[in-house]
């Protein structure tokens, strides 16, 4: 997994911003780990071309909002590199169902029949998991594989290079990244995680989507159209 590896397609602005990371020992070790896992016959999600989908879909200069997830969905056909999102034709996972419930409550947005969040990413919502790969049926299996320093650097880059972003930190894992964000430059919104285990302890009712758009408009930015088409 080097900058010259033709299998790693990274959007130009991110490639420039993260160039040094790809030369660091941890990243080379991560690449070797993934190669060994695949060689051992393990199913790794998402597929290789989609590992950096969040960065490739939302160029650095387009970022307005950052949503921090944990690791990809670990079922076949679900993950495609955007946190909380699933590919078309896959049932909407429980956490995303609660995100839709809050969107409906907060902004009266209809609940779509799918969990495909590509349209958010194309508008500047960086849907970043802190681990970008996972082994099939083993949640969190790559949490210590080496992704954390890389995705921490992604958060640091958007913190440093972008102005007046909104960071949505849902749950303790996402909130552990708050230390990487300057609250004088950006709006940080925190609540419980949308998981069914915690959604009723402060996620539902948090008003984060309307508050995000109000902040963007106050800072001269086009608000996010959170509505999603049925597929």
UniProtKB/Swiss-Prot annotation:
<dbReference type="GO" id="GO:0004844">
    <property type="term" value="F:uracil DNA N-glycosylase activity"/>
</dbReference>
<dbReference type="InterPro" id="IPR005122">
    <property type="entry name" value="Uracil-DNA_glycosylase-like"/>
</dbReference>
<dbReference type="InterPro" id="IPR018085">
    <property type="entry name" value="Ura-DNA_Glyclase_AS"/>
</dbReference>
<keyword id="KW-0234">DNA repair</keyword>
<protein>
    <recommendedName>
        <fullName>Uracil-DNA glycosylase</fullName>
        <ecNumber>3.2.2.27</ecNumber>
    </recommendedName>
</protein>
<dbReference type="GO" id="GO:0005737">
    <property type="term" value="C:cytoplasm"/>
</dbReference>
<dbReference type="InterPro" id="IPR002043">
    <property type="entry name" value="UDG_fam1"/>
</dbReference>
<dbReference type="InterPro" id="IPR036895">
    <property type="entry name" value="Uracil-DNA_glycosylase-like_sf"/>
</dbReference>
<comment type="similarity">
    <text>Belongs to the uracil-DNA glycosylase (UDG) superfamily. UNG family.</text>
</comment>
<dbReference type="GO" id="GO:0097510">
    <property type="term" value="P:base-excision repair, AP site formation via deaminated base removal"/>
</dbReference>
<keyword id="KW-0963">Cytoplasm</keyword>
<comment type="function">
    <text>Excises uracil residues from the DNA which can arise as a result of misincorporation of dUMP residues by DNA polymerase or due to deamination of cytosine.</text>
</comment>
<keyword id="KW-0378">Hydrolase</keyword>
<feature type="active site" description="Proton acceptor">
    <location>
        <position position="71"/>
    </location>
</feature>
<keyword id="KW-0227">DNA damage</keyword>
<dbReference type="Pfam" id="PF03167">
    <property type="entry name" value="UDG"/>
</dbReference>
